[in-house]
Regions:
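Short alpha-helical donor nucleotide-sugar binding micro-motif in glycosyltransferases
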Residues: 14, 128-129, 136-141
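Nucleotide-activated donor-binding/catalytic signature segment of Leloir-type glycosyltransferases, i.e.
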Residues: 114-132
Length: 183
């Protein structure tokens, strides 16, 4: 019963502002359709000095248990139901059928970690990473899985691309606006 009053309050609050800034054109269209005025898109950028293919680390890949030439598939984020990690793990299973040398690396922590670790004992769980350590994890991967449908942007997509890692994601939010199919 609170949904409509809260939505009305937020709309009034934002409409009193000179502008409401959002990260994607899709979100701008959604808010405009709900009666928000002066909605402006400001795309986010990424730190390409930090997130770079130059941070690839063969020792880290070996620590993940990858054989030479193996395929490192990475997911970065909170290990929680809203991140749709079940789909990521099913996608990885399909990848592994084609590439038995593939290894799934999950960067992050959260309420699903224990259940995921039990269900996928071959996956590598590295916990939370930050700064240069996180950047090395991205750059040392070959493929980035981002199955979430709950993000308004998802900086991880830009971080993976800046690191030279191919992203696989839904045609949604930042992925829809930042990833191009050139094939």
């Amino acid at each position: 019963w609170l949904r409509q009053p809260v939505a009305a309050y937020l709309r009034r609050f934002h409409n009193r502002s000179a502008a409401t800034f959002v990260p994607t054109a899709a979100l701008a269209a959604q808010l405009s359709a709900q009666g928000y005025r002066s909605v402006e898109v400001i795309s986010r950028g990424g730190d390409t000095a930090l997130y770079s293919p130059a941070r690839r680390d063969e020792a880290l890949r070996r620590a993940w248990g990858l054989p030479p030439g193996g395929l490192a598939v990475i997911s970065v984020g909170r290990l929680a139901p809203e991140k749709n990690l079940g789909l990521a793990m099913r996608a990885f299973a399909a990848i592994r059928r084609l590439r038995p040398d593939a290894r799934m690396v999950l960067v992050g922590d959260g309420p699903q970690r224990a259940a995921l670790a039990r269900a996928h004992p071959d996956a590598v769980f590295v916990g939370m990473r930050h700064g240069e350590d996180l950047a090395a994890h991205y750059a040392s991967a070959d493929l980035f899985l981002f199955p979430s449908l709950t993000e308004t942007f998802g900086n991880v997509t830009l971080e993976a691309m800046a690191s030279g890692v191919c992203p696989v994601a839904y045609d949604y939010a930042a992925a829809a606006e930042e990833i191009r199919d050139l094939g």
